[in-house]
Amino acid sequence: MNYAYPDEKGHYGIYGGRYVPETLMQSVLELEEAYKEAMQDEAFQKELNHYLKTYIGRETPLYYAENMTKYCGGAKIYLKREDLNHTGAHKINNTIGQALLAVRMGKKKVVAETGAGQHGVATATVCALLGLECVIFMGEEDVRRQKLNVFRMELLGAKVESVAAGSGTLKDAVNEALRYWVSHVHDTHYIMGSVLGPHPFPQIVRDFQSVIGNETKKQYEALEGKLPEAVVACIGGGSNAMGMFYPFVHDEEVALYGVEAAGKGVHTEKHAATLTKGSVGVLHGSMMYLLQNEEGQIQEAHSISAGLDYPGVGPEHSLLKDIGRVSYHSITDEEALEAFQLLTKKEGIIPALESSHAVAYALKLAPQMKKDEGLVICLSGRGDKDVESIKRYMEEV
């Protein structure tokens, strides 16, 4: 398969690009240049690998979920344990890379958006480590849902700005963070939390997250002497999935499955299934599939999981859908909750609600596969942050 994206203008087929105001164009080009140089610099790579290993705790295990495998009665199920990273999710793979880039570019301050708070915590963490000032924008609805993560960020020295505009969720936090970056661009780096935004952000985030798929490939081959038949990951903006899928894109014998949030159901208005139900448009500097109405107004995304309710999806996922290399599906709140409880009871591993969507789809897929086949789930994060809201949800039902 001939796959070489993005092109030099940052496009993935028709998707991606740089839809930014003139005031930002210079910074975006400067970032691209700095990133290219850093990727060629052995000293930068060495420093990044040092932190990945000694600070974040990589590599993360590829765990054979024997009880889940028996329960499903099909393919062997493996979990890529991104929940075991420092801060409890895959997000820090990207934030450490971008923070080191910010230091290299001479920036003193970092701005970021966050939904569930995981990216905010991972950003505040690396800023504390590297002595950078940190400002995090978070929708007020998410601030309410994720009080503990807000406190955590503040403990780490970050300033958390609550965003009341719009629906007070991730989309609105991104708007404010971009606005802040425009006016502080001389001394501030924007750490985008997913494979979104204007080029080079989707590429930078994908490349820093690719450590997930690269490790998985190596670990699976060491265990089974071949590549897995199927790989499953959840999708909000799509960074854990892109990090898992990208190293497998050329291996056409490996089926790739992306799992979106169907919320209350894709037949309702309450979902975040952008690739299933969306249409093409531009948001936050990039062309991608979006949830929008006939007039092109962005619709609110809904999911029980704060990390999946973004109304767009990364431009590279948009392309991978169109060319059929990745198969995209959606899982409802109910199905994700069931999978959350099942994995917890069967394996003693509490997954994040985001990751539970991938687990739920894998539960449908595994029984259809042969017993000598392998299925890897990207367990993108741990569920500590969700226990309180799940308790509330279960009491209401």
From Swiss-Prot:
Positions of post-translational N6-(pyridoxal phosphate)lysine modification: 91
Tell me the enzyme class.
lyase
- Give the reactions, separated by semicolons, that this protein catalyses: (1S,2R)-1-C-(indol-3-yl)glycerol 3-phosphate + L-serine = D-glyceraldehyde 3-phosphate + L-tryptophan + H2O
Q: Which CDD domains match?
A: Trp-synth_B
Which InterPro entries does the protein's record reference? Answer: Trp_synth_b_CS, Trp_synth_beta, Trp_synth_beta/beta-like, TrpB-like_PALP, TrpB-like_PALP_sf
| Any Gene Ontology biological process | L-tryptophan biosynthetic process
Function (record text): The beta subunit is responsible for the synthesis of L-tryptophan from indole and L-serine.
Q: What is the annotated quaternary arrangement, including any partners?
A: Tetramer of two alpha and two beta chains.
Give the protein's recorded name: Tryptophan synthase beta chain
The species is Bacillus cereus (strain ATCC 14579 / DSM 31 / CCUG 7414 / JCM 2152 / NBRC 15305 / NCIMB 9373 / NCTC 2599 / NRRL B-3711)
Phylogenetic lineage: Bacteria, Bacillati, Bacillota, Bacilli, Bacillales
